[in-house]
Amino acid sequence: MKIDPIRNRLYTLTVLSCYLVLTPNMLSKLAFNALHGMKEYISELIQFKKLNSLNSENNEWGEITNDSKYEINILFIGEMMRSDYLNVYGYNEKNTPFLSSVNGTFVHNFYSADTHTVPSLRIMLTYQGENSKIEPNYPKSFINAANNAGYDTYWISNQGLIGEYDTPISFIAKSATHKYFIKLHDNNAEDHDMLKVINYYISKPSKKKKLIVVHLFDSHGYGSLCDQNKKFMTENKLLKYSETNKKDVECYSSAVTKTDKIISETYKTLNSKNIKFSIVYFSDHGSSESTDNAGNIFYKHEDNDKAGYKIPLIRITSDDT
């Protein structure tokens, strides 16, 4: 991979700034992390080059019988949401008012394939079969399976992208019949902005059953979106939010409440249609709670922490009463 320092001014300025302000010890850690990240990135580029040599509709599933009774199926894919921070899974803050009140299936002790989005979802969204080596099988993605089963497939995403098809996950999304990437249209989009697109696809006339995938930004942006998320905080949460070391905790918890609200609004829309439906939610990975030198709690990716893998898996259907 070739980086042109003249064209990549931001990259050059970042490197120079690091050398000016960081200590030797910090630089050594930064260099190690940078090399590790570069190695992973190059590996992804090699794999993605192989992906681009394939047609996204290259489908190895064969004929699949569609005997599901549900006319509309919604799959919410969350981001960085660990299950023990949801009230419905036992968290002490009442941050899931809808999920805690509705009947459904709530799976405990469910774990993601990785602690980062792409490595996790490329495994979780493709068929592994009997292979002892766990690796993505893109021609056998779940979207291709739904297409073969005769579903009308939709993919709505609030994940920030350079282009629609520049990651393995967006490559899977490309196989959907209908695609809408919110952040290609609005860089400041919130997950709530997807509700109008979800409602449009729910109401869109179709002779087929529907699979609608909604890829949320979820709690991944808990810090940058915290001011927006204040409207989801109770008075008790706002009080804790004023405590410096509790700020990120309440931001993270309010992101959970926002997702709960989105699922609730979608449920209400589907329920008003008097149709058979299914809603599934899971997160791509969890997060690890950590503390900085000042005692402030924050969340990060951590391969060696079980919490980085522990995620919610929820299913709610029109049959649940």
Residue ranges of model-derived segments:
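Active-site-proximal alpha/beta segments of enzymes that process anionic O-linked groups
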Residues: 25-239, 308-310
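A long, amphipathic alpha-helix that forms part
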Residues: 56-60, 196-200, 236-279
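Histidine-centered active-site microenvironments of extracellular/periplasmic hydrolases
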Residues: 90-94, 271, 275-319
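Non-catalytic, well-ordered alpha-helical segments in soluble enzyme domains
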Residues: 147, 318-321
